[in-house]
Curated annotation (Swiss-Prot):
Keyword Ribosomal protein listed: yes
Gene3D superfamilies assigned to the protein according to its UniProt record, in alphabetical order: Ribosomal protein S8
GO molecular function, one term: structural constituent of ribosome
Assigned GO CC terms: ribonucleoprotein complex; ribosome
Keywords: Ribonucleoprotein, Ribosomal protein
Bias (Basic residues) ranges: 43-59
Keyword Ribosomal protein: yes
PROSITE patterns documented for this protein: RIBOSOMAL_S21
Species annotation: Desulforudis audaxviator (strain MP104C)
Pfam (any one): Ribosomal_S21
The name this protein goes by in its record: Small ribosomal subunit protein bS21
InterPro entries hit by this protein: Ribosomal_bS21, Ribosomal_bS21_CS, Ribosomal_bS21_sf
Amino acid sequence: MAEVRVGKNETLDSALRRFKRTCQRAGVFAEARKHEHYEKPSVKRKKKSEAARRRKRSF
């Protein structure tokens, strides 16, 4: 979990912005979005295959 210490003269808004940025860089939001709903293993494999195909096509 991301942790941000609030300085003495720091506003809550700037601390919240730093926390959001830290979570974004750590991939917390993407991970939560990925686990939002259950995904069958067959669907995971299909998505992975499609992503590889898209990557290969772009090169």
